[in-house]
């Protein structure tokens, strides 16, 4: 890992608070004073915790269990209980994600520029950048570094292009996402 990235990695993680009580956390607890004494340990701990959160979601989800059923016909059959489980899952996932920040990771996409751009604009709209200019600039800086750090190097050109267009979209008099997706 480059020295520059190691120094800037802390920008990818919000310092405004801890985990929401509804989010399951792993037993590893990281305190702020420990992060400065061991800067090379902090990134892997955060990333492992971040990844384990999504692993727990996908494995423990009733939707995941239903699709991994040995009975292929069971995948397509629906009944009232399955619909209730799906509603509960949707509610629990939306509760889980409502207090956090989701960053799009690259998957093989026919148009990664468009996907990253849409994701960034959704993040900016959810943040409502009308507060303090310095805080907004720091948030955008953090957003860019998170996308760059969490995605492979071959996607960085799409991320930087999408980020530049997101900045232009923010600075335009009447932001229209469709204009910047072409």
UniProtKB/Swiss-Prot annotation:
Name of a matching Pfam family: Ovate
Segments forming domain OVATE: 104-169
InterPro entries per UniProt: Ovate (IPR038933), Ovate_C (IPR006458)
A GO BP annotation: negative regulation of DNA-templated transcription
GO cellular component assignments: nucleus
Start and end residues of each stretch annotated as Disordered: 62-94
Record key words, sorted: Nucleus, Repressor, Transcription, Transcription regulation
Main localization, broad class: nucleus
The UniProt record lists the keyword Disulfide bond: no
Record's function text: Transcriptional repressor that may regulate multiple aspects of plant growth and development through the regulation of BEL1-LIKE (BLH) and KNOX TALE (KNAT) homeodomain transcription factors.
Subcellular compartments: Nucleus
Name recorded for this polypeptide: Transcription repressor OFP11
Gene behind this protein: OFP11
Organism the protein comes from: Arabidopsis thaliana (Mouse-ear cress)
Tissue spec: Expressed in roots, rosette and cauline leaves, shoots, stems, flower buds and siliques.
Other facts noted in the record for this chain: Plants over-expressing OFP11 have no visible phenotype.
């Amino acid at each position: 890992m480059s020295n520059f990235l190691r120094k800037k990695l802390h920008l990818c993680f919000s310092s405004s608070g801890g985990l929401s009580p509804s989010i399951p956390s792993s037993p590893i607890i990281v305190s702020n004073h420990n992060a400065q004494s061991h800067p090379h340990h902090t990134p892997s701990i955060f990333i492992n915790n971040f990844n384990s959160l999504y692993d727990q979601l996908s494995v423990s989800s009733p939707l995941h269990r239903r699709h991994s059923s040995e009975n292929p016909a069971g995948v397509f059959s629906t009944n009232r209980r399955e619909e209730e489980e799906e509603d509960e899952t949707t509610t629990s996932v939306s509760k889980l994600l409502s207090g956090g920040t989701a960053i799009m990771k690259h998957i093989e996409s026919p148009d990664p520029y468009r996907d990253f751009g849409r994701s960034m604009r959704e993040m900016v709209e959810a943040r409502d950048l009308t507060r303090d200019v310095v805080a907004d600039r720091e948030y955008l800086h953090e957003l860019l570094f998170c996308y760059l750090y969490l995605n492979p190097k071959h996607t960085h050109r799409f991320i930087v292009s999408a980020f530049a267009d997101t900045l232009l979209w923010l600075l335009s008099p009447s932001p229209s996402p469709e204009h910047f997706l072409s």
